[in-house]
Regions:
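HTH-adjacent hinge/linker in prokaryotic transcriptional regulators
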Residues: 3-71
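Glycine-rich beta-alpha loop segments
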Residues: 60, 69-84
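Glycine-rich phosphate-binding loops that contact phosphosugars or nucleotide phosphates
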Residues: 78-183
């Protein structure tokens, strides 16, 4: 059991109970995704697909509003506003989200860099000058990108601030996050 506790702590959890809750939540989220797909495919009458999808989105937005840690959100906003350079990392299915965020941040901030990559070495080449005055925004959802994790680890090692956009407070992406809930 002590090996399991050490493993959980090595992953960034306070202990085994927190790790267990995160695993349970991840399994629930995946099952819910499968269930939602099964429900939508062939079970929603043709004329109600749009309404069903939009209603689902409305419910998710309401849940986010209820669950978001507002102080963590404010810290993230302040961190972005005070950063010298903003790096945005989103790989594979998260690349369009990173591109969207970078596009609009370019209109507001003087130095925004979308880290585009096919390999871990490219990430480090694009982030080589990152310092404690900078921020990295990492975007990843299940199945979490190891390259994004490596980018956040590298940024953290260089004392840059890390902000994550992910699916859960228990996401492994939050290991290096500077703006965690409750902190």
């Amino acid at each position: 059991e002590s090996t399991t506790v050490r493993f959980a702590m090595q992953l960034g959890y306070a202990g085994y109970p927190e790790f267990q809750r995160a695993l349970e939540e991840m399994v629930m989220n995946r099952l819910n995704s499968v269930q939602r797909m099964q429900f939508t495919y062939g079970r929603v009458p043709q004329g109600e697909i749009l309404e069903t999808v939009l209603q689902s989105d409305i419910e998710k937005i309401k849940m986010t509003l209820e669950e978001v840690d507002r102080s963590a959100f404010e810290r993230a906003a302040d961190t972005i506003l005070s950063a010298r350079t903003i790096y945005i990392v989103g790989i594979r299915s998260c690349a369009p989200l990173a591109s969207f965020l970078a596009f609009y941040f370019h209109m507001i901030f003087p130095d925004v860099r979308q880290v585009q990559t096919n390999s871990s070495s490219e990430i480090f080449e694009q982030m080589i000058r990152i310092t404690e005055d900078d921020v990295v925004i990492g975007i990843s959802f299940p199945r979490y990108s190891m390259r994004t994790m490596k980018a956040l680890e590298f940024a953290n090692s260089r004392k840059a601030k890390v902000i994550t956009i992910t699916d859960s407070v228990h996401s492994p992406m939050n290991v290096y996050a500077a703006c965690k809930a409750g902190r």
